[in-house]
């Protein structure tokens, strides 16, 4: 684990947290607020007490994605294509199934789950491209 790994892990963690804020805190805020009264979702005030868990989760996401991506770099292929491939693979293996599982065990509206899957897949593709840009296959850092 070199310096690039640590820098990349931190940057991807921050990017993941920011993308999730855009997706869940801004774009889906209205959908979530409609579920607060039923007790399915926490109110924004209650959710703020759990921010340390969100930070910890995004650190795990950032460093986990960095570790996996760096193990599978193919130096013979364009970086952005590799990043998109990686982001798509993670979305198919973890992001989309995670929301399908939540839908099966929680009474969430189907429209919300579709939005979550689409927006989170786009976020994962962006994280894949960021990983590709930060890890161009050379040892500059």
Where do the protein language model's features map onto the residues?
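Juxtamembrane/disordered regions of integral membrane proteins
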Residues: 1-141
């Amino acid at each position: 684990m070199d310096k690039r790994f640590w820098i990349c892990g931190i940057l991807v963690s921050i990017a993941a947290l920011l993308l999730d804020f855009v997706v869940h805190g801004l774009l889906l805020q209205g959908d979530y607020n409609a579920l607060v009264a039923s007790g399915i979702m926490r109110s924004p005030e209650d959710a703020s007490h759990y921010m340390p868990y969100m930070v910890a989760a995004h650190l795990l996401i950032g460093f986990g994605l960095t570790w996996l991506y760096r193990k599978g770099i193919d130096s013979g292929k364009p970086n952005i294509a590799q990043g998109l491939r990686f982001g798509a693979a993670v979305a198919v293996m973890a992001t989309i199934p995670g929301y399908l599982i939540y839908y099966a065990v929680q009474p969430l509206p189907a429209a919300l789950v579709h939005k979550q899957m689409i927006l989170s897949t786009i976020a994962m593709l962006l994280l894949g491209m960021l990983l590709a840009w930060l890890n161009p296959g050379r040892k500059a850092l």
